[in-house]
Regions:
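Hydrophobic alpha-helical segments within soluble ligand-binding/sensing domains
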Residues: 19-43, 54-56, 83-85, 108-109, ...
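Sec-exported extracytoplasmic/periplasmic mature domains
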Residues: 32-40, 61-69, 89-96, 113-120, ...
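Flexible loop/hinge segments that line or gate small-molecule binding clefts
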Residues: 1-17
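Extracellular/periplasmic bilobed ligand-binding domains
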Residues: 56-151
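Extracellular/periplasmic periplasmic-binding protein-like sensory domains
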Residues: 112-190, 244, 250-258
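Segments of small-molecule ligand-sensing domains
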Residues: 172-187, 195-249
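An alpha-beta-alpha
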Residues: 15-79, 98, 196
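Second-shell loop/turn segments in exported
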Residues: 14-20, 46-49, 89, 148-156, ...
Length: 259
């Protein structure tokens, strides 16, 4: 897997491995970033019935509280909801330093624009799904300053493999006349391919059980960094990239860990 971040995906399935980090890690990383950058009060917005949104929001809340921060407002919204003024009004009254709102790329611009229309100046943050140019296109100038966590930064190649991938993918994007930004999920997809190929080579077979057993011991220097797998098939990763939207583009801010 390359983009499935819910921890339950690999539980009880010894044939499933993934190269991305998982939501408990991502939520903690974002809480650490927020607290380390001066946020003491946070609001959290999540979507009812959405495992990604509710799970990531919960992990952020727990980690932020453990650091000594206060969750001053918790709001939820329904699937397909487009008017967020009521919950944002509640949040404005709570006066948070940061709003953590893990949600879809369809919902994100609506939350961002309506928050700014209400005069909310708090930093708005989310997880990896927000690294999508659709948000910038639809939220416009209101998206400036949004912060998110992601798996990869093309400006900082982790190794020679990453540099070669970036060069090749950039050439492909130019050829196809697409936006010159490499999605993190594409880098993760490439790493999934590298891990699978290495496991097949190590197994010397295409037998599924043999490949599974080989994956348990695979180590690759992938586009998103060094990758090995733990006993549940999750990637052993200890770092996330924090990006912000500045001048209409996603720009690297820093790296953060769970420590």
């Amino acid at each position: 897997g390359c983009s499935c971040t819910n921890p339950q995906v690999t539980e009880g399935n010894d044939f499933y491995f993934r190269v991305c980090f998982i939501d408990p890690f991502q939520g903690t990383v974002m809480a650490n970033y927020a607290y380390q950058n001066g946020a003491k009060n946070a609001a959290v917005i999540t979507q009812l019935g959405d495992d990604y949104s509710s799970g990531l929001g919960s992990y952020f809340k727990d980690a932020f509280a453990k650091l000594g921060g206060s969750i001053v407002s918790e709001e939820q919204f329904q699937t397909n909801q487009t008017d967020f003024k009521a919950i944002l009004t509640n949040i404005k009254a709570a006066d948070p330093d940061i709003i953590f709102a893990p949600s879809s790329i369809t919902t994100a611009p609506l939350i961002i624009k309506q928050a700014r229309e209400l005069g909310i100046t708090a930093t708005i943050a989310a997880g990896d799904t927000w690294e999508n140019s659709t948000i910038i296109e639809n939220a416009g100038a209101d998206s400036e300053g949004v912060v998110l966590s992601t798996f990869f930064d093309e400006a900082e190649p982790a190794n020679d493999e990453a540099a070669a991938f970036i060069k090749g993918f950039k050439e492909y994007l130019v050829k196809e006349k697409q936006e010159d930004i490499i999605p993190a999920v594409s880098a993760l997809g490439y790493d999934s391919y590298l891990a699978a190929i290495k496991a097949i080579e190590d197994a010397g077979s295409t037998d599924t059980a043999a490949i599974r057993d080989a994956l348990k011991n695979v180590e690759i220097d992938g586009v998103t960094g060094n990758i090995t797998f733990n006993e549940t098939g999750d990637a052993n990763k200890d770092i996330a990239f924090i990006k912000t939207i500045k001048d209409g583009k996603f720009q690297f801010l820093t790296t953060t860990t769970v420590e």
